[in-house]
UniProtKB/Swiss-Prot annotation:
<feature type="binding site">
    <location>
        <begin position="42"/>
        <end position="49"/>
    </location>
    <ligand>
        <name>ATP</name>
    </ligand>
</feature>
<keyword id="KW-0547">Nucleotide-binding</keyword>
<dbReference type="GO" id="GO:0005524">
    <property type="term" value="F:ATP binding"/>
</dbReference>
<dbReference type="InterPro" id="IPR030947">
    <property type="entry name" value="EcfA_1"/>
</dbReference>
<feature type="domain" description="ABC transporter">
    <location>
        <begin position="8"/>
        <end position="242"/>
    </location>
</feature>
<protein>
    <recommendedName>
        <fullName>Energy-coupling factor transporter ATP-binding protein EcfA1</fullName>
        <ecNumber>7.-.-.-</ecNumber>
    </recommendedName>
</protein>
<dbReference type="InterPro" id="IPR003593">
    <property type="entry name" value="AAA+_ATPase"/>
</dbReference>
<dbReference type="GO" id="GO:0042626">
    <property type="term" value="F:ATPase-coupled transmembrane transporter activity"/>
</dbReference>
<dbReference type="InterPro" id="IPR017871">
    <property type="entry name" value="ABC_transporter-like_CS"/>
</dbReference>
<dbReference type="Pfam" id="PF00005">
    <property type="entry name" value="ABC_tran"/>
</dbReference>
<dbReference type="GO" id="GO:0016887">
    <property type="term" value="F:ATP hydrolysis activity"/>
</dbReference>
<comment type="function">
    <text>ATP-binding (A) component of a common energy-coupling factor (ECF) ABC-transporter complex. Unlike classic ABC transporters this ECF transporter provides the energy necessary to transport a number of different substrates.</text>
</comment>
<dbReference type="InterPro" id="IPR015856">
    <property type="entry name" value="ABC_transpr_CbiO/EcfA_su"/>
</dbReference>
<dbReference type="InterPro" id="IPR027417">
    <property type="entry name" value="P-loop_NTPase"/>
</dbReference>
<keyword id="KW-0067">ATP-binding</keyword>
<dbReference type="GO" id="GO:0043190">
    <property type="term" value="C:ATP-binding cassette (ABC) transporter complex"/>
</dbReference>
<dbReference type="InterPro" id="IPR003439">
    <property type="entry name" value="ABC_transporter-like_ATP-bd"/>
</dbReference>
Length: 269
């Protein structure tokens, strides 16, 4: 297939974890626009985390196809294509493999046999981009959860990916650390033209996105821009999603527009 504007395409993808189990994904089709921030949202059991597993090859489709840069992903080409995709998981403690920060960032580069001089340069550049270079010699237990997630992002950036997947990467952070991490992701996306895919149950995080896919019971429930999705905010509550605080307040005030950021709410008040 030919779609120059999409980096990842799901075409009629179905998936079940066991042959005698019900399908977790049912005939799912969507496009991930290149260079944009796509948020895939849904409650627990909606299928969103399974999508992430299929994208990085932890699981394989039962039927349908997944395309990466117009190439159908197969067993023969997967490892080559997978190198373009980085992922940051939910629990920062489960991602740290190095004894100190700089060794953790270097780990993936060692696996790719990157020469030592280039490795040193890439590690320093990646840590500088996430404001963690001064902590390059810190042990993991000296870092906060937000700082550990910054190191996880640095580890991904050092590999020069085209796509970064955030799989519930902010869910264990406090509100300030969460917002700081989202601000960092926005900066990284802008500076490197990286495609961001955030997998989340938090609609507040989806407000950051250019493109939103809402999953429910293994199917695509809604898809569109953040404005288009939140203009039908009440429908989202019927599938178990909690509306972001600014939208709740906006509705309580009787205003017409459903989509409203925190900054927009302050302006209205």
């Amino acid at each position: 297939m030919e779609d120059k504007n999409s980096v990842i395409v799901f075409k009629n993808v179905s998936f079940q974890y066991q042959s005698d189990a019900s399908f977790t994904l049912k005939d799912v089709s969507f496009n991930i626009p290149k260079g944009q921030w796509t948020s895939i949202v849904g409650h627990n059991g909606s299928g969103k985390s399974t999508i992430a597993k299929l994208m990085i090859g932890i699981e394989k489709v039962k039927s349908g196809e997944i395309f990466y840069n117009n190439q159908a992903i197969t067993d023969d080409n997967f490892e080559k294509l997978r190198k373009d995709i980085g992922i940051v998981f939910q629990n920062p403690d489960n991602q740290f493999v190095g004894s100190i920060v700089k060794y953790d960032v270097a780990f993936g580069l060692e696996n790719h046999a990157v020469p030592h001089d280039e490795m040193h340069r890439r590690v320093s550049e990646a840590l500088e981009q996430v404001d963690m270079l001064e902590r390059a010699d810190y042990e993991p237990n000296a870092l906060s959860g937000g700082q550990k997630q910054r190191v996880a992002i640095a580890s991904v950036l050092a590999l020069n990916p085209s796509v970064i997947i955030l799989d519930e990467a902010t869910s264990m952070l406090d509100p300030d650390a969460r917002q700081n991490l989202l601000d960092l992701v926005r900066k990284v996306k802008s500076e490197h033209n990286i495609t961001i895919i955030s997998i989340t149950h938090d609609l507040s995080e989806a407000m950051e996105a250019d493109h939103v896919i809402v999953m429910n019971k293994g199917t695509v429930y809604k898809e569109g821009t953040a404005t288009e999705i939140f203009d039908h905010a009440e429908e989202l509550t019927t599938i178990g999603l909690d509306l972001p605080f600014p939208i709740k307040i906006n509705q309580m005030l009787g205003h017409q527009t459903s989509f409203l950021t925190y900054e927009g709410l302050v302006d209205q008040l």
